[in-house]
């Protein structure tokens, strides 16, 4: 793979490494870029994506490279190009050019890494983070003898790390939680491309077409503007399937199309969901539920301010949604009591959002260590237990706000979840049946926390009901 200098100037990466060192102290650090993963044989690989911690500090997608250093002294270790690389892969920047662009002192052959680690005090004194790619993980194991398992990046817990590695993880989290100007510029650029994609998808939507045609229109805009999908796009009339991987169905009049699609630009992600009527017009029940979800989105966004606990942002969305369900006669009871009991989670089972940055779920490779503040752990309550983020918000954090309403058979047919609400009359199934044409609605925005009112970075992507209908081709 050809390696190119980063888009930004070296001062961006020098500043980030200095902030990391200020948070960490004088521990030496090694971070791995990772390797391409094969699809079905060694030479047929998935598109390469550098590990985000390496990318954050270098701006460079460099397969197999390792960043090593401390203080202001940093080097990159990489495999020298093969004699025929230019034939197959094209010209690559010289190592001197790359070193200057990244702001490191030198780039050296990967074979010299082991001796360099010894020069920095040895593996026991050096901090690193678990690599994602299997080959890099094996390389780390050989160099550092760390006791990491294959599934240490579990969402529901902290990755077990040595003392130096744990210190690095906490320092990296503290630096990456709030974004610098260069990061925000890339996120804004990704969202602008996402805006184009969603408008293209809306314009192509009509009864009789397939979901994959809409997905292709969206992702064409990503490609045409130098971006890639930040994750597997969800484009589905089965909006009740939260992480639907399939887009093969034909769209019919009366369907709602849920589209969760975001562009990634220079490694920085966006994450936006809109839901629109295939026929170009909401039915009365669809419109009623859409407006409830939209109000939950608006009310939660308004809570995105410095010092506010993100769990409270989630609970605000839950209260607004529950109030709407009570108004529609689907639930009965006191709003706060219903939320405390988790009645809303029958229809809104996931958390209201997550961190956004280089990763679409930023830093989730570090598990709940990144998403949950010190002393905070996941709730055991259904619904609230899926909340990915429970930190106090700070200026220049970017989070998603994505409430939804879903009619999920696996939930609504589960006596252990619905039984208490059926028995005491809280859940009014006869009234709920009137909303059978609402399979799933989600409205998601990317929001920057500022010193004042929140900045909705994705505000230009239509979400008011009439604005959405006006964009649909039908």
Label every PLM stretch briefly.
Residues 1-474:
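Active-site neighborhoods and metal-handling regions in enzymes and metal-associated proteins
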């Amino acid at each position: 793979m050809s390696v190119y200098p980063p888009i930004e100037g070296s001062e961006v990466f020098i500043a980030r490494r200095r902030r990391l060192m200020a948070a960490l102290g004088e521990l030496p650090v090694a971070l791995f870029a990772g390797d391409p993963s094969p699809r079905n044989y060694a030479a047929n690989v998935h598109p390469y994506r550098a590990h985000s911690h390496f990318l954050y500090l270098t701006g460079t997608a460099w397969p197999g490279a390792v960043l090593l250093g401390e203080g202001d002294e940093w080097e990159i270790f990489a495999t020298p190009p093969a004699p025929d690389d230019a034939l197959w892969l094209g010209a690559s920047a010289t190592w001197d050019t790359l070193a200057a662009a990244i702001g490191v002192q030198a780039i050296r052959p990967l074979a010299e890494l082991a001796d360099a680690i010894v020069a920095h005090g040895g593996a026991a004194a050096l901090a690193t983070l678990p690599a994602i790619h299997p080959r890099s993980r094996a390389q780390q194991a050989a160099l550092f003898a760390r006791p990491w398992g294959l599934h240490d990046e579990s969402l529901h817990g902290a990755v077990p790390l040595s003392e130096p590695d744990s210190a690095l993880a906490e320092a990296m989290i503290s630096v990456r939680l709030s974004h610098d100007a260069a990061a925000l510029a890339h996120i804004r650029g990704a969202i602008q491309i996402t805006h184009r994609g969603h408008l293209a998808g809306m314009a192509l939507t009509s009864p009789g077409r397939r979901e994959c045609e809409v997905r292709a229109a969206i992702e064409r805009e990503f490609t045409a503007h130098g971006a890639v999908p930040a994750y597997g796009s969800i484009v589905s009339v089965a909006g009740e399937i939260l992480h639907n991987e399939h887009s093969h169905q034909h769209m019919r009049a009366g369907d709602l199309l849920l589209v969760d699609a975001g562009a990634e630009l220079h490694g920085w992600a966006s994450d936006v969901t809109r839901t629109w009527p295939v026929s170009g017009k909401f039915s009365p029940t669809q419109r009623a539920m859409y407006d409830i979800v939209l109000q939950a989105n608006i009310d939660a966004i308004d809570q995105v301010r410095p010092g506010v606990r993100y769990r409270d942002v989630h609970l605000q969305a839950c209260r607004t949604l529950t109030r709407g369900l009570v108004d529609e006669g689907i639930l009965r009871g006191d709003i706060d009591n219903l939320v405390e009991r988790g009645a809303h989670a029958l229809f809104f089972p996931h958390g209201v959002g997550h961190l956004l940055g280089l990763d679409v779920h930023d830093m989730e490779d570090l598990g709940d260590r990144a998403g949950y503040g010190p002393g905070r752990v996941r709730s055991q309550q259904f619904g609230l237990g899926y909340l990915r983020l429970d930190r106090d918000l700070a200026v220049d954090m970017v989070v998603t706000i994505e409430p939804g309403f879903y009619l999920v058979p696996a939930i609504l047919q589960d006596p252990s979840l619905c039984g208490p609400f059926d028995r005491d009359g809280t859940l009014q199934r006869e009234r709920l049946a009137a909303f059978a044409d609402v399979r799933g609605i989600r409205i998601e925005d990317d929001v920057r926390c500022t010193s004042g009112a929140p900045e909705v970075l994705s505000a230009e992507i239509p979400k008011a009901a009439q604005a959405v209908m006006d964009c649909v081709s039908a």
